[in-house]
């Protein structure tokens, strides 16, 4: 059960945010188009700034420490492991052109930015969740991406889907999914993850994978033959044959889905403390993008 949080101002909460998701969401949202005075499409960048201001103003979220991570570019070491893994291919050029711009906008807001190249934004989020969890009351991972569920830890590390207004802790995840957060990479190896280009194994769906991992936790522990299984998903004989024939593929897919939790992040927890929006840089950013209405939007300014 999610802990009932009260006296927000007394809590130390670290929000780690999937900036790439925020950028894509803003680009494809119905919000009005916006072009910077220089002529480039700035809709997504302005959208992310508006989204972050809403978060910073949300009394229920009560942000005290914050970092936002971006894939820049959308390519990592995983592309060297598997040709089909997600990449920049197919990203609209007007969106791709905003990858650097949105990071600059986040700096203007006073947020710590984790710009990932060799690793992915998700790896930075996972690293932050592991590294700082024991120093704060709660780490809140802001993304709907299902692979981040592997980071859940009691109600100390939770996942927040702002769009659905849903917060998931470890107990909720176990109750609804039927397996442990540590099994998430194994689950994605079996079922696939279209967003990341992981194909999964033919025939495995949510129900069969959940049953098996609820019983065995990891791929290596699943017996080779179905008659030895303690659970009986539909089509067990064929599933066992598929897993036996494609076990190496499954192990590769699991490696792709396993977050790196040792990304070299330079910041201490104190570096992540949100102390307000720096007025000069933010107002200059607003002027450069022609969004003067946002100049007075922040409710908390950083002391000079």
PLM features: what roles do these ranges have?
Residues 1-2:
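Short hydrophobic transmembrane-like helices used for membrane targeting/insertion
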Residues 9-142, 146-166, 250-252, 258-266, ...:
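Noncatalytic, basic helical substrate-engagement surface that gates or grips nucleic-acid strands
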Residues 60-64, 164-304:
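Non-catalytic nucleic-acid-binding/docking modules located in mid-to-C-terminal regions
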């Amino acid at each position: 059960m999610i802990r009932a949080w009260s006296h927000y101002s007394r809590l130390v909460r670290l929000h780690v945010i999937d900036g790439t998701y925020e950028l894509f969401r803003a680009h494809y949202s119905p919000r009005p188009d916006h072009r910077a005075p220089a002529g480039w499409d700035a809709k997504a960048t302005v959208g992310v700034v508006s989204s972050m201001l809403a978060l910073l103003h949300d009394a229920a979220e009560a942000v005290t420490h914050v970092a936002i991570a971006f894939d820049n570019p959308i390519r990592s070491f995983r592309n060297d492991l598997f040709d089909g893994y997600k990449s920049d291919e197919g990203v609209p050029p007007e969106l791709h052109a905003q990858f650097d711009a949105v990071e600059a906008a986040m700096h203007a807001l006073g947020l710590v930015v984790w710009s990932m190249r060799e690793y992915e934004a998700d790896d930075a989020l996972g690293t932050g969740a592991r590294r700082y969890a024991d120093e704060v009351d709660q780490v809140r991972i802001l993304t709907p991406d299902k692979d981040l569920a592997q980071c859940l830890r009691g109600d100390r590390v939770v996942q927040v889907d702002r769009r659905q207004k849903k917060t998931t802790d470890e107990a909720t995840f176990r109750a609804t999914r039927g397996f442990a957060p540590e099994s998430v990479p194994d689950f994605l190896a079996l079922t696939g993850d279209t967003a990341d280009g992981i194909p999964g194994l033919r025939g495995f769906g949510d129900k069969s994978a959940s049953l098996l991992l609820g019983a065995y936790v990891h791929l290596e522990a699943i017996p080779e033959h179905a008659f030895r299984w303690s659970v009986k998903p539909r089509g067990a004989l064929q599933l066992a044959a598929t897993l036996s024939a494609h076990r190496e593929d499954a192990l590769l897919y699991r490696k792709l889905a396993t977050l790196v939790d040792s990304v070299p992040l330079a910041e201490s927890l104190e570096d992540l403390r949100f102390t307000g929006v720096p007025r000069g840089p933010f107002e200059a950013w607003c002027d450069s993008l022609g969004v003067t209405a946002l100049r007075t939007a922040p409710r908390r300014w950083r002391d000079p």
